[in-house]
């Protein structure tokens, strides 16, 4: 009812808790959320995700009110790439096209030529000239993976996701031995040794699609465990096993920041229309260009 009264739309990332995903009007990965935000006719966007996702929505929809239930929901990748340090890195490599992963702050996007997500990074890199000099940040593991499948030699920033870097290769091998018919699904933010074990490497949306279409009954999933909710909903007859982290005493395959988005906070955010995302207009004017470039290229490529 609150949504109807306020003409609000609730968007949720696949990494949020299942109860949040079930309440959302739209659930997706970073690319799908950006595409949806750019086209929504709602007056208020409630972004159930981390801070940079709210910023991206606000940059794309400056006239709309964009809310995030907890402003402390940041991102280890975005935090690993401070805008001033990244700008200095860019200046140290003149003549390079700058590609930033969507998991960055608005200020970092502002010194970027084109933004990518894990759904379109390979295709966008391949759309550039073969001899193009490229800087890629902040996720070094994703950058290494893109280099390996495209033959490019992008200069990489040294950032990492606190969830994806903690998966245990040895424990995944043990799981695979115990479940020999299981397919291993891995996000490209994982370390290279995990990706070598995978039957498929892809974005959350790509892994979900593979799980739905593949005939296997069991899957070992090496990405944030929130995606298992959507996988299980789509395929109740299949078994999805979260890939274990090195440290078995923690829920390390959960994003600490995504888990800050709770049902109570979502209700309060809708009721009080707070906390609101704001982006400095000067930064937004620069950051919108690489985001639009990503959306334009993705549309041309049918992504």
Question: Which residues fall in each region the model found?
Answer:
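Active-site loop-to-helix "anion-binding N-cap" substructures in soluble metabolic enzymes
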Residues: 1-202, 206-221, 228, 232-243, ...
């Amino acid at each position: 009812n609150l949504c109807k009264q306020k003409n609000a739309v609730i968007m949720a990332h696949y990494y949020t808790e299942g109860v949040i995903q079930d309440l959302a009007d739209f659930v997706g990965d970073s690319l799908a959320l950006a595409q949806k935000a750019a086209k929504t006719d709602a007056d208020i966007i409630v972004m159930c995700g981390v801070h940079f996702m709210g910023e991206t929505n606000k940059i794309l929809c400056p006239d709309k009110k964009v809310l995030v239930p907890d402003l402390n929901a940041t991102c280890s990748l975005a935090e690993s790439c401070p805008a001033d340090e990244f700008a200095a890195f860019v200046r140290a490599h003149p003549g390079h096209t700058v590609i930033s992963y969507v998991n960055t702050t608005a200020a970092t996007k502002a010194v970027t030529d084109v933004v990518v997500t894990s759904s379109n990074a390979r295709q966008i890199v391949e759309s550039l000239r073969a001899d193009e000099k490229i800087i890629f940040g902040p996720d070094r593991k994703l950058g290494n993976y893109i280099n390996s499948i495209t033959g490019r030699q992008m200069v990489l920033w040294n950032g990492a996701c606190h969830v994806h870097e903690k998966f245990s290769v040895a424990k995944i091998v043990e799981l695979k031995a115990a479940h020999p018919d299981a397919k291993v699904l891995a996000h490209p933010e994982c370390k290279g040794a995990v990706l070598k074990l995978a039957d498929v490497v892809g974005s959350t949306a790509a892994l979900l699609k593979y799980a739905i279409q593949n005939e296997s009954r069991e899957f070992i999933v090496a990405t944030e465990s929130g995606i298992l909710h959507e996988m299980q909903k789509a395929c109740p007859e299949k078994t999805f096993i979260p890939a274990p982290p090195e440290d078995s005493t923690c829920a390390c395959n959960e994003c600490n920041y995504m888990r800050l988005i709770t049902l109570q906070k979502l209700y309060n955010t809708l009721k009080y229309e707070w906390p609101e995302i704001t982006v400095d207009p000067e930064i937004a004017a620069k950051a919108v260009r690489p985001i639009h470039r990503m959306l334009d290229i993705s549309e041309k490529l049918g992504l």
